From Swiss-Prot:
Keywords: Cell wall biogenesis/degradation, Endoplasmic reticulum, Membrane, Protein transport, Transmembrane, Transmembrane helix, Transport
Principal localisation: endoplasmic reticulum
Keyword Glycosyltransferase: no
Domain of life: Eukaryota
Location of this chain's protein in the cell: Endoplasmic reticulum membrane
Spans traversing the lipid bilayer: 51-71, 83-103, 111-131, 157-177, 183-203, 223-243, 248-268
Membrane topology reported for the UniProt record: Multi-pass membrane protein
Annotated protein name in UniProt: Chitin synthase export chaperone
UniProt record, GO biological process: cell wall organization; protein folding; protein transport
Family: Belongs to the CHS7 family.
Lineage: Eukaryota, Fungi, Dikarya, Ascomycota, Pezizomycotina
Length: 331
C-alpha cells in the first residue's frame, strides 16, 4: 500500500468512504469492496445494513445523552461548556454514521457522497474539539468565557469545513482531486486527526503529573487510549477474520464503534475526575448535604447553652468558631 491510498484499508474494513474511492473499473463504477462485511437484515420490507453496528450506534447515542446530562448538572465545573460541545459533536457524528451504516443513505444514492463527507467532517471536528479542550486545564484563558467557547467552536467548525470539503472534492473529482488521488483525503482524515489525539494525550499527562496529586486520572487516559487503539486494530486488521468466524453477522465495524464509545466514556471519566464543583454554588441543588449525626445529651447541651450567663448570646453555636483558613473567626 502506497502512502495516501485506501486500497489495503478498504479491503479489510467496511467504512463508508470506501464506496467512493479507488480506480474506476471497466464498467465505470468506483469503490473498493471489503473482503467480508456484515450481512443485511430485512425488517418490515426494509433492508438494513450493519444491524449489530446500528444497535451499537443507538446505545452510543443513549450513553452520550446521559453523559451530557451529568455534565450539565455540574454548574460550576471547569470546562463544562467546552466538554459539552465535544459530546454534542460526537452525538452528531454518531447520527451521521448511523445513517450511512444502516443504509438510510445507501451507496450509489446521490446523497451518499455528501453524507460521507459530513461524516469525515464531524470526525475531524471531534478530534479538533478534543485538542482545544486539552488547553482548558492549563488555564491559558478563562474557561466558559466567550473567548474560550468561540475559540473551540470556530476551530471545530474550521476543521469540519476543511475535512468535509476535501472529502467531497475527492469523491466528486473536483478541483484536481479524484477518487484515485486520495493523498489529501488521507492526510486530513487520518494524519491530522491522529496528531490532534496524540497532542491531547501528551498534554493531559503533563497536566496530571505537574498539577495533581492524585494519579488516578492517568488510568482514565490509559484506558481511553487502549480502547481507541484496540478498536482501530480490530477494524483494520481483524475485521475479515471476525466476519468470517461469526458467519457475517457482524464485522470489525461493530467492535470499532463499541471501542470508540468506551474511549469517549473514558474522556468523560477523566474530565469528571479532575473537575471539582464549588460547594457554595452547588449546595442548593443537592438536598440533605448536611445532617445531624447525633444529638448532644441533655446535660451537655445545657452546659453549652449557658456557658456564659453574662451574655445573652453566650449560647450561640458560632462562639469562637474556627475559620476554614486556619485563623480565628471575627464572629
Amino acid at each position: 500500500m502506497s502512502f495516501g491510498q485506501f486500497d489495503s484499508l478498504c479491503r479489510k474494513a467496511a467504512i463508508p468512504l470506501c464506496s467512493l474511492v479507488g480506480s474506476s473499473s471497466l464498467s465505470g463504477t468506483k469503490g473498493i469492496l471489503p473482503s467480508c462485511y456484515a450481512r443485511n437484515i430485512e425488517v418490515a420490507n426494509t433492508i438494513i445494513f450493519q444491524g449489530a453496528t446500528d444497535v451499537m450506534h443507538i446505545v452510543a447515542l443513549a450513553m452520550t445523552a446521559i453523559m451530557i446530562i451529568h455534565v450539565r448538572s455540574k454548574f460550576t465545573a471547569v470546562g463544562r461548556k467546552e466538554i459539552i460541545t465535544f459530546f454534542y459533536i460526537y452525538m452528531a457524528l454518531t447520527i451521521c454514521s448511523l445513517v450511512l451504516d444502516s443504509g438510510v443513505a445507501p451507496p450509489g444514492n446521490a446523497v451518499f457522497p455528501f453524507f460521507a463527507a459530513v461524516q469525515n467532517g464531524f470526525a475531524s471536528a471531534l478530534c479538533t474539539c478534543l485538542l482545544v479542550n486539552g488547553f482548558v486545564g492549563f488555564q491559558l484563558y478563562e474557561d466558559g468565557t466567550a473567548l474560550s467557547v468561540w475559540l473551540l467552536r470556530l476551530s471545530s467548525l474550521g476543521m469540519f469545513l476543511i475535512s468535509g470539503a476535501v472529502s467531497l472534492l475527492t469523491f466528486k473529482s473536483w478541483a484536481g482531486l479524484s477518487p484515485s488521488n486520495t493523498i489529501g483525503l488521507f492526510v486530513v482524515v487520518y494524519i491530522l486527526n491522529a496528531i490532534c489525539l496524540f497532542v491531547y494525550v501528551v498534554m493531559q499527562i503533563i497536566l496530571v503529573v505537574n498539577t495533581l496529586q492524585d494519579r488516578w486520572p492517568l488510568w482514565h487516559i490509559t484506558f481511553g487510549v487502549f480502547f481507541f487503539i484496540i478498536g482501530q486494530v480490530i477494524l483494520y486488521s481483524f475485521s475479515a477474520v471476525i466476519c468470517e468466524s461469526v458467519q457475517h453477522y457482524l464485522d470489525g465495524l461493530f467492535f470499532a464503534t463499541l471501542c470508540n464509545l468506551l474511549a469517549v466514556m473514558m474522556i468523560y471519566k477523566y474530565w469528571d475526575s479532575i473537575t471539582k464543583e464549588d460547594l457554595e454554588f452547588s449546595v442548593g441543588l443537592k438536598q440533605n448535604n448536611w445532617e445531624v449525626k447525633e444529638l448532644l445529651p441533655e446535660e451537655e447541651r445545657r452546659a453549652t447553652v449557658y456557658l456564659d450567663t453574662n451574655s445573652e448570646y453566650a449560647g450561640s453555636v458560632y462562639h469562637h468558631r474556627s475559620s476554614t483558613y486556619g485563623g480565628q473567626s471575627n464572629y
